[in-house]
Amino acid sequence: MSQIDKASRRQKIKDRSRVKVHGTMAKPRLCVYRSLSQIYAQLIDDDNGKTIMAVSSMSKENKALEGTKSEVCTVVGKQLAEMALAKGITTVVFDRNGFRYHGRLKALAEGAREAGLVF
C-alpha cells in the first residue's frame, strides 16, 4: 500500500469517527496524534472549539525521558490523566484520530486509564 493510499485511508477513518465522537466540557475528547517519533495528546471541548489541555513527548519535562517510544507514551498518558484529574475531569471520549488502537496509541490509553481517567 502506497503512502498516499495510507494517508487517504486514515483520513476516511478519521472523518467517519469524528461524526460519532464529540467532546463537551464535562466529557472532553481525548485526541491523539502519532508522528514517526513523537506523540501528542490533547483534551478538546468541541462545543466551544477550545483545547482544554495538551501534553506531548516534546514537552520540556518529557524530552529527557529514556526508554522505548511505548514507555514514553505511557508516561505521557499518565501526565495527561493527572492534569485532567487536577481540573476535575474524570471521563473522556477517546478519539484515535484514524490510527489503529495498537502499540503506542494503546500504551498512551492504558497509561491514562492507570492514572484514573475513565473511557
From Swiss-Prot:
According to the UniProt record, one GO cellular component term is: ribosome
Q: Which PANTHER family match?
A: 39S RIBOSOMAL PROTEIN L18, MITOCHONDRIAL (PTHR12899), LARGE RIBOSOMAL SUBUNIT PROTEIN UL18M (PTHR12899:SF3)
Q: Which Pfam families match?
A: Ribosomal_L18p (PF00861)
Assembly mode: Part of the 50S ribosomal subunit; part of the 5S rRNA/L5/L18/L25 subcomplex. Contacts the 5S and 23S rRNAs.
Q: What is this protein called?
A: Large ribosomal subunit protein uL18
Transmembrane residues, as ranges?
Answer: none
Q: Which HAMAP family match?
A: Ribosomal_uL18_B
What are the protein's UniProt keywords?
Ribonucleoprotein, Ribosomal protein, RNA-binding, rRNA-binding
Q: Which GO terms describe its molecular function?
A: 5S rRNA binding; structural constituent of ribosome
